[in-house]
Amino acid sequence: MRYGSGLLEEILRRTDLVQLVGRRVKLERRGRVMWGLCPFHKEKSPSFKVENERRTYHCFGCGKGGDAFKWNMEMEGLSFPESVQKLAGEAGVELPAWTPEDEAREQKKKSLYDIVEAACVFYETQLRGQVGSEARQYLKSRGLDDAAAKQFRLGYSPSNNSLIAHLKAKDVSLDDMVTAGLARPGEDNRAPRDFFYDRLMFPISDSRGRMIAFGGRGLSPDAKPKYINTGETSLFSKGQQLYNFATARPAALKDGSIILAEGYMDVIALVRSGFEASVAPLGTALTEDQLHLLWRTAPEPILAFDGDDAGLRAGYRAARMALPHLKAGYSLRFAFLPPGEDPDTLIRTSGGGGMKKILDSAEGLARVLWRVETDGKDFSTPERRAGLERTLGEIVSAIRDGKVADYYRREFEERVFESFKRRAPRATQQSRKTEGRNFRRDAPRFGAPLESISPALKAS
């Protein structure tokens, strides 16, 4: 439903923003402005201000800001319509009546949430029963006990269409099961069947903690693919969600940091070792929507990737995807694990302390881009060095924020200069005196449109 600007303005006018923010942040008055410690990042001195007159909040440290609608969206994980509805109710503003179509659509969605939740409970029950013994044994082999299974609501999907029978007994129609992504319709005179069978189940929730989908790991050696997710539904789009986000969000807002691992088991291992603000994408490379979800909780999320070539390529893809969205104070950091290790295996062998060392040494985005383009490569000829400069120029050109792009340009210029200055012919005494002063004039200038893409980028 669309809301007119006049209605939205009336809701904001009736909302006491200081009181709203004050429920979560201790505020102190300085003149007509209220100040407090920013809830979006760690700080020791208050740089977060709230102004009722302007009806806005803003942090001078991390740049977060907005109005009452944005506050509820950030702090409670609400969508914009949900934030409008909540504030309107608190402010006593009557919203336009829903059409019958609006009401039917909302009721349908609510019904689907209930169905997915019922499936989650069913899978949990199966894991604890006799049919789930193999799944429990697998969890044990990965160092996870019953408490871990309960904490993450892990489950098991049998291979006998038992979910369909269970939901039918609860008066759930087959059409609704299919719509929720829990069943496959029958084809060619074959009976409908469960979408997941003989798999360890990882429930996926939305940002408010409502169950919306599942990831399933095959337990049979012949299971292909090893992992599958619920298909796209009206509740779930895998490129817009992150595993464990609803639980990780409060911890991330408190600590100002969030970790993105590669898979479900990595997240579970991280959380169990004390890294509560840990999430994972859902079988895809990091998407723009997921990047913005991360930035809503922390200005510099840490991406924890395997330390092999595949992990480095994954980090490079994430870095290139993020370039157009970079802005002052918001970037990515990368923690590359030793070859052959992932967070789950590293924590099992080295504990949380070993993982902390890796996270503490996380590299900045610019450093990772430089590494991928230069590590192990020969730049002994002018043509190869020119090719590197061309590729770095493309990277800078992809950054839309002018100020951030300028800093990347400077950093790459300095790295090129430091890397190649020793290759130059012996300078005269006079040229050595002026070398430093002339760097800005003579150094390569990155950012112009490029004619080609580097082989490294094509390979990624």
Where are these regions (language model features)?
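Short linear loop/turn motifs
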Residues: 33-36, 86-90, 98-105, 149-165, ...
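A charged alpha-helical hairpin associated with nucleic-acid processing machineries
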Residues: 5, 206-207, 249-258, 285-301, ...
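Conserved phosphate/pyrophosphate-binding and hydrolysis machinery centered on Walker-type P-loop NTPases
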Residues: 11-14, 31, 102-113, 129-132, ...
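N-terminal structured subdomain of primase-like DNA metabolism proteins
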Residues: 1-103
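Phosphate-handling DNA/RNA-contact segment within nucleic-acid enzymes
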Residues: 3, 15, 30, 104-112, ...
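A general alpha-helix detector
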Residues: 20, 67-71, 118-122, 134-138, ...
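Conserved active-site segments centered on acidic
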Residues: 6, 82-137
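Short, conserved phosphate-binding/catalytic loop or strand-edge motifs used
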Residues: 55, 89-93, 136-141, 146-162, ...
